[in-house]
From Swiss-Prot:
Catalyzes the transfer of a ribosyl phosphate group from 5-phosphoribose 1-diphosphate to orotate, leading to the formation of orotidine monophosphate (OMP). The lineage of its organism: Bacteria, Bacillati, Actinomycetota, Actinomycetes, Kitasatosporales. This is Orotate phosphoribosyltransferase. Its EC number is 2.4.2.10. It catalyses: orotidine 5'-phosphate + diphosphate = orotate + 5-phospho-alpha-D-ribose 1-diphosphate. Its cofactor is Mg(2+). The keyword Protein biosynthesis does not apply. It comes from Streptomyces coelicolor (strain ATCC BAA-471 / A3(2) / M145). Pathway: Pyrimidine metabolism; UMP biosynthesis via de novo pathway; UMP from orotate: step 1/2. CDD domains: PRTases_typeI.
């Protein structure tokens, strides 16, 4: 475990893990919630997210990252900044839940991704629904999705659903066991 990876893990444990009954965005109930917005929007932790996810995806060739708004937005931004700090150009994009009815009426916002290799990111996924929605939109925009990457995997089948449904690798930085949530 790199120092950065260990530091982010501790930040997640300290700031993002909330115990108690909660209803997840998927509609499922859980005995805990990992509120990763407390990490991805935190001035101390967010830069670590970018570094850890860049390391996680280091073996992949891609030049843009993004996913379904809102969970993916700060993840993609942190990766963009971490890449710049390493002297690497990496663009970010945002996938809207539905296309805008005005302006350019785009569903995928940001630099053009048509013809580009991209990684779809998410903070965490329970059912795989948000990343799969993003993969579909990104493919419709003409990009090649090389992987889906998340910060935390809840071990609830999202990875399998993404691999089977989208046919791309599913990567995650931390499993729920590392967070002491077994």
């Amino acid at each position: 475990m790199t120092d950065v990876r260990g530091e982010l893990l501790q930040q997640i444990k300290d700031k993002a893990v909330v115990h108690g009954k909660v209803t997840l965005s998927s509609g499922l109930e859980a005995d805990y919630y990992v509120d990763l917005r407390r990490i991805t929007l935190d001035g101390e932790a967010a830069p670590l997210v970018g570094q850890v996810l860049l390391d996680l995806t280091a073996d992949l060739e891609f030049d843009a990252v993004g996913g379904l708004t809102m969970g993916a937005d700060p993840v993609a931004a942190s990766m963009l900044h971490a890449a710049a700090a390493r002297g690497r150009r990496l663009d970010a994009f945002v996938v809207r839940k539905t296309a805008k009815a005005h302006g350019l009426q785009r569903r995928v916002e940001g630099p053009e991704i048509k013809g580009r290799r991209v990684v779809v990111v998410e903070d965490t996924s329970t059912t795989g629904g948000s990343p799969l929605t993003a993969v579909e939109a990104v493919r419709e925009a003409g990009a090649e999705v090389v992987a889906v990457a998340t910060i935390v995997d809840r071990a609830t089948g999202a990875g399998e659903k993404i691999q089977d449904g989208a046919g791309v690798p599913y990567l995650y930085a931390y499993g729920k066991d590392e967070l002491g949530l077994d």
